[in-house]
């Protein structure tokens, strides 16, 4: 009996050791590849910048947010074989400049600093936009990264102005920031989990010298109310929740960009994982850490999560298109969360993120040439129900992929 128990203990130890070695091997392999990955990414973005710069100025585009003749690359039009340029008021217009900032951080090449400054500067009008929540995301990815990476206070006033503008979309009765629609809309008050990504700007501004702590209160309130109404008991995220402004209750749940109200849109789940991890970093409130873990456990433990870590565009749509952008956001969130968790839980999150980054860095997902306009990641899905940008590169996919690689590099040193 003793020999049998001893054999079982040794076998268990061997299995554990094998798992540890596999994890170490995967991390070592990715770490060894990092210089080459960053070099390829830099070459791609030099070419992308060269192609996009002549297209920066074009016809005046009229959007709800305003008029502008300035454009930023968003993706690649496969059918037309050309860049998809969007107005500076487009919700992802900060991601391309943000990727340039990350490449400057990754390589130290002054070229990327110069180009990041050029593309960032044209986005300043977003600080005054009141017609949606997206402008704050634009400003944080561009000017926010300029502040963080350059270590300057030059952009503090602009970021503070953006926070003030965003706060105008906050309803203190509901405790939420309106995502879509005009501030005066009495019929609908739409909120999406993507909104959590804006809270970082509020937290950063609240901590500036002389910063207004009201922004921290708004961010916490929005995070708390989103936690209460936007997720099922199993941790799956709902995309669109519409609130009644008279009763202060949920009046409708919509599938939005997801397959249905009872599944979880993969990128929406990723936004939420990222948002609550960030809120824990900024506030130290353990409720946000615990919730980030719950959301992450739902994603990485879902029976429909593919073995390579790149999710289908919706967790309820197995066998359909994968979404590389969702994987990139998840990987970045999981790496940060792993550092907070530590122990076995942290090791689990880190290992899954490494698997995702390894997959995204493979020829299946990483573009080796200019076939997708020199963007990095293939196979992104923006809005499947609407038939928009399916199986294509996406600017925010590249942005979070680079961010995740930088986080991994910092942890692996």
Residue spans for each PLM region:
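Bacterial N-terminal signal peptides
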Residues: 8-17
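Glycan-recognition and catalytic cores of secretory/periplasmic carbohydrate-active enzymes
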Residues: 22-413
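Bacterial N-terminal signal peptides that target proteins for export
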Residues: 1-9
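Intrinsically disordered, low-complexity serine/threonine-rich segments
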Residues: 6, 21-22
């Amino acid at each position: 009996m003793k020999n049998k128990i001893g054999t079982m203990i040794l076998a268990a130890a061997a299995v554990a050791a094998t798992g540890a070695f596999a994890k170490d091997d995967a991390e070592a392999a990715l770490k060894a590849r990092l210089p080459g990955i960053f070099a390829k990414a830099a070459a791609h973005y030099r070419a992308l910048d060269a192609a996009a710069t002549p297209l920066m100025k074009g016809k005046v585009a009229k959007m709800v947010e305003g008029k502008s003749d300035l454009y930023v690359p968003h993706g690649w039009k496969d059918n037309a074989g050309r860049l998809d340029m969007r107005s500076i008021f487009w919700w992802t217009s900060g991601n391309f400049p943000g990727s340039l900032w990350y490449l400057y951080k990754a390589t130290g090449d002054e070229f990327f600093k110069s180009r990041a400054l050029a593309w960032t500067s044209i986005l300043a009008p977003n600080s005054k936009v009141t017609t949606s929540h997206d402008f704050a995301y634009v400003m944080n990815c561009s000017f926010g990264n300029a502040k963080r990476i350059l270590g300057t206070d030059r952009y503090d006033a602009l970021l503070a102005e953006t926070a003030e503008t965003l706060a105008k979309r906050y309803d203190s009765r509901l405790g939420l920031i309106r995502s879509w629609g005009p501030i005066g809309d009495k019929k609908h008050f739409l909120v999406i989990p993507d909104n959590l990504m804006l809270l970082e700007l509020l937290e950063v501004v609240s901590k500036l010298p002389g910063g207004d702590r009201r922004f921290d209160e708004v961010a916490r309130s929005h995070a708390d109310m989103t936690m209460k109404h936007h997720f099922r008991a199993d941790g799956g995220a709902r995309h669109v929740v519409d609130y009644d402004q008279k009763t202060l209750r949920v009046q409708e749940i919509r599938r939005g960009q997801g397959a249905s109200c009872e599944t979880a849109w993969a990128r929406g789940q990723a936004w939420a994982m990222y948002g609550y991890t960030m809120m824990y970093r900024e506030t130290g409130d353990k409720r946000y850490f615990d919730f980030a873990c719950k959301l992450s456990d739902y994603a990485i433990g879902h029976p429909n999560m593919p073995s390579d870590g790149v999710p289908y565009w919706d967790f309820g749509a197995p066998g359909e298109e994968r979404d590389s952008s969702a994987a990139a956001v998840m990987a970045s969130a999981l790496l940060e969360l792993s550092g907070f968790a530590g122990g076995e839980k942290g090791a689990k999150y880190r290992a899954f993120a490494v698997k995702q980054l390894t997959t995204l860095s493979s020829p299946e997902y990483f573009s080796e040439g200019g076939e997708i306009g020199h963007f990095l990641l293939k196979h992104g899905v923006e809005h499947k129900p609407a038939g928009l940008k399916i199986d294509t590169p996406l600017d925010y996919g590249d942005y979070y992929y680079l961010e995740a690689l930088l986080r991994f590099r910092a942890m692996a040193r």
